[in-house]
């Protein structure tokens, strides 16, 4: 009898282990299903260079689509107060109208300066309703919060807060929130991988209780590995039966890339058949030439994840996302996949962009004009030059009367009976342009102003 029991247990163990890896063929199917090669452009962009927009969450209520996103009110990582959470609506997932705030700064609380929210309990089904489910008659939202000013945790650690509302989602109104965080790096059961700070969190309603509780929170946090001392951002899980009291999963972190400074974060999970798909972003990955990108992993049990080794889903490739193209929220509707992501350009302008599985046109939303930050300024000087011939030529007489031209310019028309390779007209011509440099474009603190100017001429006297 003992031998039979041991054999049965061994078979069960092997079967469980085999389930942990999602086969490559299935991963390729997921990639083909989710890829979005057509970049539509920006969906939401700041109106000025004193704000940055980040972290989209998209859901449906009735016949409208809604997007929450966070807004940072600073030009750099140090000069702003912090995050607030806003909401926008759309009829078609492409064109968005801003409605207003849902989580604002609140003085005198633990989260006075940071309130970046992420709506909870979304429908996890790929191509499903994308509605937010209610629990106890309320909609819920977890958020990264803190008292430190600046961009995210630049000055002080962030913790995880909880907010809710019983009002319609389609109106911009302030959500209620608890007076203290539900998760903190100072909790007695806080784990090594989250000891520095906590970041984005999303709560899913797993009614099958795969991990023993109905509410599963995926969150990313920063910490140092106790053995290697590698500092990185990793993804872990917390569980709850009532949305308010949370217990950390003992096997955390459940997903990470162990390279110093690497970020693995912002898990967005949907279920494709029997497989859970985690859309996530990675940054400063040594194997990539670009700095930040979106890709995916897959799992049968929410804990053991198989990383996709093929082409990334979203990478920097446009002038609006050339620095970072990261932080996924993916929706499939009416046969089209919409991949919302945070786009950051080299001027550090930050907004929400969309890529799609089918061509959907081009967005009319753009970042504001970039500010001149550097000591180097580029001016176009190709218009309005005066020019005149200075001497006799082989096939023409000098004419001292100037004429106004744009450069590149050539006096020769290449006509004439000889049709020489270098033209028929030979001699000397003068070109003159007077321009004024606007000193106001240079900051007063720029001590190099007035010392050096470089003019590069192209196309005067050239031929093709």
What is each PLM-predicted segment?
Residues 1-4:
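Positively charged n-region of N-terminal signal peptides that target proteins for export
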Residues 343-345, 456-459:
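Non-cytosolic beta-sheet module surface loops
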Residues 19-117, 121-199, 204-262, 270-323, ...:
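Beta-rich carbohydrate-recognition and catalytic domains
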Residues 9-17:
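Hydrophobic h-region of N-terminal signal peptides that target proteins for export
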Residues 368-458:
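Extended carbohydrate-recognition surfaces in non-catalytic/accessory domains of CAZymes
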Residues 54, 84, 199, 265, ...:
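Residue-level marker for the onset of beta-strands and adjacent loop->beta junctions
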Residues 462-464:
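Short, surface-exposed beta-strand/strand-loop-strand elements in extracellular ectodomains
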């Amino acid at each position: 009898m003992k031998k039979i029991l041991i054999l049965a247990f061994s078979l069960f163990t092997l079967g469980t282990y085999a389930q942990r890896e999602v086969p490559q063929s299935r991963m390729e199917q997921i990639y083909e299903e989710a890829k979005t090669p057509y970049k539509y452009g920006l969906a939401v962009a700041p109106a000025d260079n004193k704000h940055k927009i980040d972290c989209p969450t998209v859901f449906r209520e009735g016949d409208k689509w809604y997007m929450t996103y966070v807004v940072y009110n600073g030009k750099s990582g140090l000069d702003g107060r912090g995050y607030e959470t806003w909401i926008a609506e759309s009829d078609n997932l492409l064109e968005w109208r801003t409605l207003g705030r849902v989580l604002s700064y609140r003085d005198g609380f633990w989260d006075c300066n940071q309130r970046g929210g992420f709506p909870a309990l979304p429908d996890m089904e790929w191509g499903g309703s994308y509605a937010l489910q209610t629990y106890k008659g309320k909609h819920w939202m977890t958020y990264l919060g803190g008292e430190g000013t600046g961009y995210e945790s630049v000055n002080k650690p962030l913790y995880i807060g909880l907010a809710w509302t019983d009002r319609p989602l389609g109106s911009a109104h302030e959500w209620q929130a608890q007076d203290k965080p539900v998760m903190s790096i100072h909790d007695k059961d806080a784990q090594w991988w989250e000891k520095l700070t906590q970041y984005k969190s999303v709560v899913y309603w797993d009614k099958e209780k795969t991990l023993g509780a109905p509410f599963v929170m995926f969150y990313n946090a920063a910490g140092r590995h106790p053995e290697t001392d590698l500092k990185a951002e990793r993804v872990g899980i917390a569980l709850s039966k009532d949305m308010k009291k949370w217990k950390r999963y003992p096997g955390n972190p459940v997903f990470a890339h162990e390279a110093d400074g690497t970020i693995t974060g912002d898990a967005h999970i949907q279920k494709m058949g029997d497989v859970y798909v985690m859309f996530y972003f990675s940054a400063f990955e040594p194997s990539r030439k670009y700095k930040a990108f979106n890709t995916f992993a897959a799992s049968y049990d929410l804990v053991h994840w198989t990383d996709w080794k093929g082409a990334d889903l979203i990478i920097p490739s446009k002038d609006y996302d050339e620095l970072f193209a990261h932080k996924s929220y993916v929706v499939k509707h009416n046969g089209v996949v919409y991949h919302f992501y945070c786009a950051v350009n080299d001027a550090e302008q930050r907004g929400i962009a969309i890529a799609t599985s089918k061509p959907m046109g081009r967005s009319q939303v753009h970042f504001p004009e970039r500010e001149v930050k550097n000591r180097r300024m580029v001016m176009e000087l190709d218009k309005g030059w005066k020019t005149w011939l200075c001497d006799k030529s082989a096939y023409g007489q000098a004419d001292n009367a100037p004429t106004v031209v744009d450069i590149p310019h050539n006096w020769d028309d290449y006509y004439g009976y000889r049709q020489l390779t270098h033209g028929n007209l030979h001699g000397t011509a003068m070109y003159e342009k007077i321009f004024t440099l606007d000193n106001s474009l240079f900051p007063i603190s720029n001590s190099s102003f007035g010392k050096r100017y470089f003019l590069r001429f192209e196309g005067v006297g050239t031929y093709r």
